[in-house]
Amino acid sequence: MNQTLIQEILEVVEQAAIASAKLTGLGQKDEADAAAVEAMRLRMGKIEMKGKIVIGEGERDEAPMLYIGEEVGSGSGPGVDFAVDPCEGTNLCANNQRGSMAVLAASDTGGLFNAPDFYMNKLAAPPAAKGKVDIRNSATENLKILSDCLGLSIDELTVVVMDRTRHKDLIKEIRGCGAKVQPISDGDVQAAIACGFAGIGTHCLMGIGAAPEGVISAAAMRALGGHFQGQLVYDPAIAQTSEWADYTKEGNIKRLNEMGITDIDKIYEANELASGENVVFAGSGITDGLLFDGVKFERDCVRTSSLVISTLDSTARFTNTVHIKDGAKSISL
C-alpha cells in the first residue's frame, strides 16, 4: 500500500457518499444502499490492485455486488483486503438524520478479521485509556478508570450507547454512576471513532452492535492509537433482536465453529481485528455527523467531507473536496 492507493481509497468512499446522498430523506433506505454499493464498486474497479472483499454486503448468493470474497480492482498490483459498509446508517440516510456515512477499512492481504454476520459487544475509548479500560470490567469500573485517564469527573463523561432494549440495564448503570448517556439509533462506527478525538464531547462507546462494523471501527482506532475491544455475541437472549427470532444459541455456536471460530468467547483487541502491517480507514459523510459534514449539493459543484486514518504515516486527515460539475461558472469558498 502507498499514498497513491490511499488517495484512491478516499475517492471510493466519496463516490459512495455522493450516490447515497442523492436519496437522503426520501425514505428509500434500500435504494440508498444500492446506489452506494454500485458507486463504491465502480470506483474500486479502476484501482490498480488485487482487491478482495472480506466483509461486505453478504455472501455471494445474498448480494449482487461487494459480496464476501468478491475480487475488486484491476487484478494487478498490491493485494488489498477490504471491509466495507457503503452506506452505514441506511435508516439515517433515508430519514435525513445525523450520522450516516460511507466507510471502509483496508489492509494488506490477510490483515482484517473476517467477522461473521453476528453481533459484537464493543468498547471504544480515547488513546489515554488504551489498555487501561477493559471490556471484562463493569461499566462502573471502566467509567472510574476513564475518569482518571482523562482527568474528568464521572459526571463530565458522555457514553454513546445504541438505543436498543438489550442496553436497558447498561444505560441504567451508566446513569447511576452520574455519567451522561448519548443514545444513537444507528451508526456506531462514527461514534466509536469519535471517542478517539478530544473536543467532540463523547468519551466512550459501550454495548452491542454489528460485528462487521466492529472490524471497521477497530481498524480506525488501531490507526488512531485509541482503545477498541470486541467480543462476539452468539446468544439470542443477549442480542435481543428480531433478526434472530428463529435462531438458537446452540445453532449460532455451530455456525461459528463451521466458520473456524472455536474460541467463541475470545476478546479481540484492535490489533487482532485489524492485524495487517498497513491499515487504513476511510469514511465520507452522507449526512452531517460527529466527525464531518454530509454531502452538500450546489449549482456548480458537490462538496464532500471525509476522514482518512492511516498507519502508513500515522496520520488522520480531514478532507473537504469540491467535485466540480461540467460547465461550472463559479465555485465559492
Curated annotation (Swiss-Prot):
The keyword Magnesium does not apply. Pathway: Carbohydrate biosynthesis; Calvin cycle. One of its GO terms (biological process) is glycerol metabolic process. Its EC number is 3.1.3.11, 3.1.3.37. Substrate binds at residues 88-90, 119, 164-166, 186-188. GO terms for molecular function: fructose 1,6-bisphosphate 1-phosphatase activity; metal ion binding; sedoheptulose-bisphosphatase activity. Belongs to the FBPase class 2 family. This is D-fructose 1,6-bisphosphatase class 2/sedoheptulose 1,7-bisphosphatase. It comes from Prochlorococcus marinus (strain AS9601). The lineage of its organism: Bacteria, Bacillati, Cyanobacteriota, Cyanophyceae, Synechococcales.
